């Protein structure tokens, strides 16, 4: 007997696969079980019972067609009927006596009967009648294999198992329930929220007002920090949901590339249809070959004395009924196959739209999917559309951003953020956030913050809670794409004073920054397109009505004409061009109110003529250019308010005599050039307070230096000075004197007359000793005296002790 458990391995599969089995596949599966039971039952009967029973035919026949078994049965029936008629006479007064029946003797023993039965079973019985139950089992197993092949094939089973694993986790995830419940709650409150005032909006956790940057976001950004603890996810659940988002992204990217699942399902369905047609045809034709009486001709006269037999196929009647039942089940199975083909071709299964889910849930950014991803979702819908609805939550970027926000709030509580507060060089209390996946809502609980720096923060969204930062004046966006909501923009527009934006792509510049009407300083750092028409951000400067400082560190070939839009109030304009040659500077002429102008690393060879028309200019900085001559300096006399001139880090070989025309100069920086001689006319600029000639090739300092009675800073380090004029020490207000890395052999004792001296640099010279009079520099401390230790030790003990005490 064949146990049914032996066939378990053919039908066994993971219970989770049921989500990918539509109703027709389930029906087909149960039909195959029924057909399998028919085959197993037939095989059991075939094995356990006699297959055929034969009796010899006393009429000899050479071929099977001559054997008259059927006529024999008819004759037997007729004779029986005639005998019955003769034995049952009509009722008369008298009746004949009963006739005695006598049987035929065949003179065969049991072994001969067994031999004949086996011979006739093999030679006379039709093959369909012999192997019918086995064929049913084989065909049914093939149907089962075809129906489940894509669950076992390596190329498809891995994707299916991965999908089912993710689908189950998404269905059971607490984040799915939370997201759907929040959306359903928000949709009922959306209309009242739009009518609330800004103050009301800021106090409610479920508020969001769309802005150009966020108007298309389907899920309002709730303030996660203020949600009730009953609905809040713990940290572990948040991390699990975050991992699910990553898995869904990777799975979608992997599966949407091809259509292997769809093709495999299509092929196995077509194969089942073809096999169904073949099996139905040959079974319908051959089912009539199952006979109860089977004539048999076997040449066994020498062994048995007979060569023709009439055999009884004992299971013919039952097999014929099983065959008809099998054909009925097979017909229903075929209908499911044809319906599957109809379903496959009726609609585009390689495209799946979440339109109904978007309308029902309110999550408007759920993307439509294609190829194998779409196909498996169509199959899941046939099982239960709720799976797709809950799975769609993990396809939404807005849902992911909200989860990220929740995890951020767990990771960065307000107390932890306060520990990161630092003071900037300007004295502001700054919070620096680096490489975070978003902006925690808890940031807006740090009310004492004055400056917020966001560096490489992905998708930072500034909510209306920013109004809590009443002391916020400065915002830095370093390689950070930031979006603001309408209520946030209303607050920043009136309160933000300083903004720094560093970018790698012009698209990273948020356009909302050009609507900050209270902004006073704007600093842009990044590469702009050489074609200014492709720089739309620079076309919006006209909205910055309060802008006073504009800094651009980029690679411009010409000054944007739109800079003139802020000419009426711009006071400081800086360009750091990173070595790119600045060719066109005509736009400078319109900056009539500019007081400070910096053109750094612009590859300028001469002082631009456009500068000379800036009558309000006070500070001119041309650092790190390629200036060889400054003969045009005479034209700077038109800039009557010019007080600071920085021409440092260039290749200037000499100072022209007409520098004396710049009577108002208070600071002149010519360090890091190639100047050989200092003209005496320079010292006619008697208002100089800061003179830096360090790291040139100067060999002599003119005695006219003593004319500069207001001089407080003198830098002569890195030159070839061998001696200092006595007149230098007439500059009684000198506070900083840098003479390091020269060739000085001694220092005049008159250095003691510099009572205001705070810093004296002498390191790197050829001195053997220091004058004791250096101790008369009452303001000079040991920290301000930069000399070698051995040289310091040449001072008298009392002088050294004085410095040490200080």
Swiss-Prot record:
Glycosylation sites: 57, 80, 312
Primary localization: membrane
GO biological process: aspartate transmembrane transport; cell volume homeostasis; cellular response to osmotic stress; cyclic-GMP-AMP transmembrane import across plasma membrane; monoatomic anion transmembrane transport
LRR repeats: 569-589, 593-614, 616-637, 641-662, 664-685, 687-708, 710-731, 733-754, 756-777
Transmembrane segments: 23-43, 131-151, 276-296, 324-344
Extracellular side: 44-130, 297-323
Intracellular or extracellular location(s): Cell membrane; Endoplasmic reticulum membrane; Lysosome membrane
Membrane topology label: Multi-pass membrane protein
InterPro entries: Leu-rich_rpt, Leu-rich_rpt_typical-subtyp, LRR_dom_sf, LRR_domain-containing, LRRC8_Pannexin-like
Assigned keywords, A-Z: Cell membrane, Disulfide bond, Endoplasmic reticulum, Glycoprotein, Ion channel, Ion transport, Leucine-rich repeat, Lysosome, Membrane, Repeat, Transmembrane, Transmembrane helix, Transport
One Pfam family matching this protein: Pannexin_like
Cystine connections: 54-311
Family, per entry: Belongs to the LRRC8 family.
Role of this protein: Non-essential component of the volume-regulated anion channel (VRAC, also named VSOAC channel), an anion channel required to maintain a constant cell volume in response to extracellular or intracellular osmotic changes. The VRAC channel conducts iodide better than chloride and can also conduct organic osmolytes like taurine. Mediates efflux of amino acids, such as aspartate, in response to osmotic stress. The VRAC channel also mediates transport of immunoreactive cyclic dinucleotide GMP-AMP (2'-3'-cGAMP), an immune messenger produced in response to DNA virus in the cytosol.
Free-text note regarding domains: The volume-regulated anion channel (VRAC) channel forms a trimer of dimers, with symmetry mismatch between the pore-forming domain and the cytosolic LRR repeats, a topology similar to gap junction proteins.
Record protein name field: Volume-regulated anion channel subunit LRRC8E
Organism from which the protein derives: Xenopus laevis (African clawed frog)
């Amino acid at each position: 007997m064949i146990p049914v458990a032996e066939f378990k391995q053919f039908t066994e599969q993971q219970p989770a696969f049921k989500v990918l089995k539509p109703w027709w596949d389930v029906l087909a599966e149960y039909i195959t079980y029924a057909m399998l039971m028919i085959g197993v039952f037939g095989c059991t009967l075939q094995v356990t019972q006699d297959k055929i029973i034969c009796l010899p035919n006393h009429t000899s026949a050479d071929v099977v067609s001559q054997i008259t078994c059927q006529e024999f049965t008819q004759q037997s029936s007729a004779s029986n009927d005639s005998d019955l008629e003769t034995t049952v006479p009509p009722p008369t007064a008298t009746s004949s006596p009963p006739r005695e029946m006598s049987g035929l003797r065949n003179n065969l023993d049991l072994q001969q009967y067994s031999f004949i039965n086996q011979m006739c079973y093999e030679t006379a019985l039709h093959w369909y009648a012999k192997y019918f139950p086995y064929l049913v089992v084989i065909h049914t197993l093939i149907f089962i294999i075809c129906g489940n092949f894509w669950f076992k094939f390596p190329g498809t089973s891995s994707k299916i198992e991965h999908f089912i694993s993710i689908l189950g986790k998404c269905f059971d995830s607490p984040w799915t329930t939370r997201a759907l419940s929040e959306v359903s709650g928000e949709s009922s409150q959306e209309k009242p929220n739009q009518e609330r005032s800004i103050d009301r909006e800021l106090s409610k956790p479920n508020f969001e007002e769309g802005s150009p940057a966020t108007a298309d976001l389907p899920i309002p950004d709730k303030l996660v920090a203020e949600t009730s603890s009953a609905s809040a996810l713990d940290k572990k659940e948040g991390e699990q949901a975050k991992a699910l988002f990553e898995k869904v992204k990777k799975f979608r990217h992997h599966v949407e590339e091809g259509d292997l699942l769809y093709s495999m399902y299509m092929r196995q369905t077509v194969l089942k249809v073809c096999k169904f047609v073949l099996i139905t045809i040959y079974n319908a034709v051959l089912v009539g070959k199952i006979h109860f009486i089977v004539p048999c001709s076997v040449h066994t006269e020498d062994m048995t004395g007979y060569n023709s037999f009439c055999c009884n196929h004992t299971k013919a009647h039952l097999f014929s009924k099983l065959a008809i039942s099998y054909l009925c089940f097979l017909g229903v199975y075929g209908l499911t196959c044809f319906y599957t083909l109809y379903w496959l071709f009726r609609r585009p299964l390689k495209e799946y739209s979440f339109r109904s889910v978007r309308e029902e849930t309110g999550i408007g950014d759920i993307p439509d999917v294609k190829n194998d991803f779409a196909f498996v979702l169509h199959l899941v819908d046939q099982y239960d559309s709720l799976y797709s609805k809950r799975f769609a939550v993990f396809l939404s970027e807005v849902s992911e951003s909200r989860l990220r926000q929740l995890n951020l709030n767990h990771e960065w509580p307000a107390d932890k953020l306060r520990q990161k507060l630092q003071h900037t060089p300007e004295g502001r209390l700054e919070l620096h956030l680096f490489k975070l996946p978003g902006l925690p809502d808890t940031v807006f609980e740090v009310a004492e913050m004055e400056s917020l720096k966001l560096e490489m923060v992905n998708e930072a969204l500034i909510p209306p809670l920013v109004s809590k930062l009443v002391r916020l004046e400065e915002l830095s966006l370093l390689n950070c794409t930031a979006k603001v909501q309408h209520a946030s923009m209303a607050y920043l527009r009136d309160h933000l004073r300083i903004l720094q934006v560093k970018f790698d792509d012009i698209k990273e510049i948020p356009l909302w920054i050009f609507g900050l009407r209270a902004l006073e300083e704007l600093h842009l750092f990044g590469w702009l397109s050489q074609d200014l028409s492709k720089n739309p951000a620079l076309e919006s400067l006209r909205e910055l009505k309060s802008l006073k400082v504009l800094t651009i560190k980029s690679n411009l070939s010409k000054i944007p004409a739109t800079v003139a839009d802020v000419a009426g109030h711009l006071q400081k304009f800086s360009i750091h061009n990173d070595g790119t040659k600045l060719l066109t500077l005509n736009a400078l002429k319109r900056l009539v109110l500019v007081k400070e102008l910096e053109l750094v690393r612009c590859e300028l060879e001469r002082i631009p003529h456009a500068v000379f028309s800036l009558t309000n200019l006070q500070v001119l900085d041309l650092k790190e250019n390629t200036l060889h001559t400054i003969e045009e300096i005479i034209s700077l006399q038109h800039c009557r308010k010019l007080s600071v001139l920085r021409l440092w880090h260039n290749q200037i070989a000499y100072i022209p005599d007409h520098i004396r025309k710049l009577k108002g100069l208070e600071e002149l920086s010519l360090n890091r050039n190639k100047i050989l001689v200092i003209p005496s006319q320079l010292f006619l600029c008697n208002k100089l307070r800061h003179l830096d000639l360090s790291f040139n090739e100067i060999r002599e300092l003119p005695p006219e230096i003593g004319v500069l009675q207001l001089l407080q800073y003198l830098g002569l380090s890195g030159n070839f000075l061998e001696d200092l004029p006595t007149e230098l020490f007439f500059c009684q207000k000198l506070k900083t004197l840098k003479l390091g890395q020269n060739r000085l052999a001694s220092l005049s004792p008159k250095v003691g007359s510099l009572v205001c001296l705070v810093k004296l640099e002498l390191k790197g010279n050829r001195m053997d000793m220091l004058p004791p009079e250096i101790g008369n520099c009452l303001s000079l401390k040991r920290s301000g005296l930069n000399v070698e230790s051995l040289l310091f030790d040449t001072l008298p003990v009392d002088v050294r002790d004085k410095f040490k005490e200080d």
